[in-house]
Amino acid sequence: MFGCQCPRKKKGTMTMMRLRTASLRSLNLDMRCTIRLLDDTEISFNIQRDTKGQFLLDYICNHYNLLEKDYFGIRFVDPEKQRHWLDPSKPVAKQMKSHPPYTMCFRVKFYPHEPLKIKEELTRYLLYLQIKRDIFHGRLLCCFADAAFLGACIVQAEIGDYDPDEHPDNYICDFKIFPKQSQKLERKIVEIHKNELRGQSPSVSEFNLLLKAHSLETYGVDPHPCKDSTGTTTFLGYTAAGFVVFQGNKRIHLIKWPDICKMKFDGKTFHVVVMQKEKKNILTYHTSTPAACKHLWKCGVENQAFYKYAKSSQVKTVTSSNIFFKGSRFRYCGKVAKEVVEASSKIQRDPPEVHRSLIPHSRSSYSLNKQLIINMEPLQPLIPSPNEEEEEEEEENQIDEGILLLQQSEASSAPVLGNSPARGLETTADVTHDEEESIREEPLTISEQVYNPSASLLPTPVDEGIDMLFNSPLRAEREKDDTDSFEDLEADEHAFLIAEEEEMKEARKALSWSYNFIMGNMQLNAFLKSFSKLLLAAIGLLMVVLPLLLILLESDIDVSFLREIRLTPEFEQFHHEYYCPFRKWVACKLSAALNLFGST
């Protein structure tokens, strides 16, 4: 028997050692990570489980030989299609909610407020690639004239001067610059490319695009879809100026960073506490999921810290909760905008070589937002900045200085504007007045139907539209438009329309009742939450006060401040009139209970 037990014990010990060895090896296993760059190329490498996000960011910046790296970040999408920015201070494996191999994207995280203060051409080129993506995915809204100029700058940067021997009449059709390009827009791009941009090098054309893009209202805006308190779809975003709110193509709010006291969230509800002219206001918005709300809050905290403060040492840890309850805590750990600009001015090295890679022009945009039309009226802000005219004058002076610097640094590629004779456009000669009238300029809106914040030809970003998040009625309209077989039916069309109207009325009643019911429940839940928080705070206070009273009443500790409290008339009255009778009553009850227990 004794001999049989020994092998069994040894076998069990060996099994445990194998399990421990396997677990230790799993910590050192390499995980495959792929990062997609701004030109859609990819870099793949192996990381370990404890590798932090800063390693990935440094790896990409070393690949580019990039010094002005604080504008950039790495973004990924979790299995629930929620986007996140990779936290450089935390391990990558703990942030990813999926299994390796991991796929992430290198993107501009903080858009420079003044492109003129970017020191190196390499940084400007990467920002140019990001803005080109924003234009293609419909995130950068602009009027028709600005759209034509931006498109012409992209064409000039990628193919150079117009050459009639190399470029046929319809050469712009090969460029998919916008989600949807009208013929009128393409003709205007051709006109500007032929006559106004001749002689500009790629760096000058890219710089001109940055100057135009940064003057637009949606420059740097990554719209977050939300519902306001009335149920209207809005898009929230952050810029160097502050917090912006869009409805359609109209900016309805611009709240500057110094006016924002606090940003917090609770579940799917996002709050912005604003102090303007000594008046406190709270703006409330509702997201589709709690994860989207937390992402919106973290982006707001990071952008406010980056653009508002003068030094990174001034940035404090922010919490999303109230005083007595633990919530999400977050602190931005990078440099702020002023420190980045100051560090850029101190760069002393030979400019690194810029390797420009052209994205194929023939890629189709029909898999993205089919309804997006770039021809639009200019955006008119409902709340303009009070110092808007002064800012525009300063920007114009800076633009002139920047162009002079570029011309001096690149004498061989200085832009020659309007020196060549203008060639007639063959395509415009055949267009009649009726055709011009038929090409309508429809407004571009950041709407449920057209905006997809992570639309891409690659499989990683989100493919679903915003209407999936909020069950938009636009989907029902699309499904209704797909049924075209009613002409074959012998039913009375008029009766069918009447029945359809009745059904729509009933649906509206049901929707209004559901909305009122949900809003009532939300208000009730908010009241219950506040009451429960107050009750818990009172219980916590009692848990602190009662032990202190017992120490004062029962202990013989002779400390000066305790002796002074005991000698007060109020304490003596409480001791003789309340505490002593209560103690005697408790002692009697306990003795009776003990006697009863002893008798049984």
From Swiss-Prot:
Gene Ontology CC, one term? membrane
Sequence ranges assigned to domain FERM in this UniProt record: 31-311
Task: Give the start-end ranges of region Disordered.
Answer: 413-440
Under the heading SMART domains, the entry gives: B41, FA, FERM_C
- Entry membrane topology: Single-pass membrane protein
- Pfam families listed in its UniProt record: FA, FERM_C, FERM_M, FERM_N
Give compartment(s). Answer: Membrane
- Give GO MF terms, alphabetically: cytoskeletal protein binding
Fetch the CDD domains from UniProt. FERM_B-lobe, FERM_C_FRMD3_FRMD5, FERM_F1_FRMD3
Reading the lineage from the top rank, the first entry is: Eukaryota
Tell me the PROSITE patterns matching this sequence. Answer: FERM_1, FERM_3
Name under which the protein is recorded: FERM domain-containing protein 3
Q: Please tell me the species this chain comes from.
A: Xenopus tropicalis
What gene, per UniProt, encodes this protein? frmd3
